Amino acid sequence: LILLDGGYIQNEDVAADLATDLKQVQEFYKSYQFSSWESYLEHEKAYYQRWSDVVQRAALAKMTEDEDKRIISKTKLSTYEAAIKSLHIYPSKVIYSEVECPILLLRSSLPEASNAMKEVAAKRLIRAASDATDQIIPNAGHNLHIDAPHEVANRIKKWIEVHKNYDRENLKRRNVWE
């Protein structure tokens, strides 16, 4: 199982309850609108460490123009809400002690302000999983596969090489969540 800067931070890490999370996602959805394709692309360019034609095509593919000519997400609010609800119903912290395969967590180093929280969450995942590896990708934000594609690919390749002869029968499972 390979996690690209996701799936390890829990609701309690950000002190969020379901109502708060739903309110935040609704506010995000309403605010994530743009008056033109140009203003949307400028916004997106500021978010990434590197920009390319491929990244631009991906950015354009996730948006659409509504009847009022606003640039909005193709993903519906109900989809975002369902994802948030699922994280509260089935938190990943409950799942990791049941995972019977190696886990590689590649996590971002930017923004630096969130690194302490990410460190705590990563250590918790390592304790819960039977075979987990945590690696930080330097100078990369949440979209680390875009910010540092070669570094991410090399780390995944090396990790797969080490785990290619994985022996499921000898895996020792521990549950540190209780």
Where do the language-model regions lie?
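Short aromatic-enriched loop/helix-cap "lid" or pocket-rim segments at secondary-structure transitions
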Residues: 12-18, 117-119, 148
